[in-house]
Amino acid sequence: MSNFAVSLPEVIAVLPAAGIGSRMLVDCPKQYLTVGGKTIIEHAIFSLLHHPRIQRVIVVIHPQDTQFSRLSVAQDPRISTVYGGDQRANSVMAGLQLAGQAEWVLVHDAARPCLHLDDLSRLLSITECSQVGGILAAPVRDTMKRAEPGIQAIAHTVDRQDLWHALTPQLFPLELLKLCLSRALREGVAVTDEASALEHCGYHPILVTGRSDNIKVTRPEDLALAEFYLTQRQSLNNDSL
């Protein structure tokens, strides 16, 4: 039997949480709404910190945010905070500046409270076989329609065979993500997720199949769905004890 262990690359997580979540129609940013006994952002952070390969989580907050520092998780020594910008890409870049010499960086939405540990493990395993990185994603199951420009009328059906829903976390080499985000921002490219910045630079990140219950809370009805998933998971955990 081997007497040495393989050393896996260090991974730092960045959690952009500087948005206001206007579609939720509530007074506070959506990441501070409570679901399953904790705020959404706490669920997101704990899902990362429970994995042994995540060394640190950098939370990117709005400059006027007064709520994060009140959470108990904010006192965890593995948590750092930095102020974000007016776009997601600017906020992620701010987080990357605190990542130090980490080889890999993992970016996760603060509004995704239902990440499974096994999905995270599968994504992290690509550091052993990829130099570009990858994302959690779910194959599209529904029939997809493209609308006529500017109106809610069907133009045609889109072939779903090669379509995937992009999820988070998304995992990339730190320096590569910095390079691609910087170029995308400089060239005015709309960056809706980190993978799109790499795509703009000609890279093809891996699609790692993730669970479809890893939802992003963006609308009021998503809260009840997240509550259901988290309660169901807790019930399964209790049954296994």
UniProtKB/Swiss-Prot annotation:
HAMAP family: IspD. GO terms for molecular function: 2-C-methyl-D-erythritol 4-phosphate cytidylyltransferase activity. SUPFAM superfamilies: Nucleotide-diphospho-sugar transferases. This is 2-C-methyl-D-erythritol 4-phosphate cytidylyltransferase. Pathway: Isoprenoid biosynthesis; isopentenyl diphosphate biosynthesis via DXP pathway; isopentenyl diphosphate from 1-deoxy-D-xylulose 5-phosphate: step 2/6. Keywords: Isoprene biosynthesis, Nucleotidyltransferase, Transferase. The record marks 160, 216 as: Positions MEP for the nucleophilic attack. The record marks 23, 30 as: Transition state stabilizer. Belongs to the IspD/TarI cytidylyltransferase family. IspD subfamily. It is an enzyme of class 2 (transferase). Its EC number is 2.7.7.60. Gene3D superfamilies: Spore Coat Polysaccharide Biosynthesis Protein SpsA, Chain A. Homodimer. PANTHER family: 2-C-METHYL-D-ERYTHRITOL 4-PHOSPHATE CYTIDYLYLTRANSFERASE, CHLOROPLASTIC. It catalyses: 2-C-methyl-D-erythritol 4-phosphate + CTP + H(+) = 4-CDP-2-C-methyl-D-erythritol + diphosphate. GO terms for biological process: isopentenyl diphosphate biosynthetic process, methylerythritol 4-phosphate pathway. Catalyzes the formation of 4-diphosphocytidyl-2-C-methyl-D-erythritol from CTP and 2-C-methyl-D-erythritol 4-phosphate (MEP).
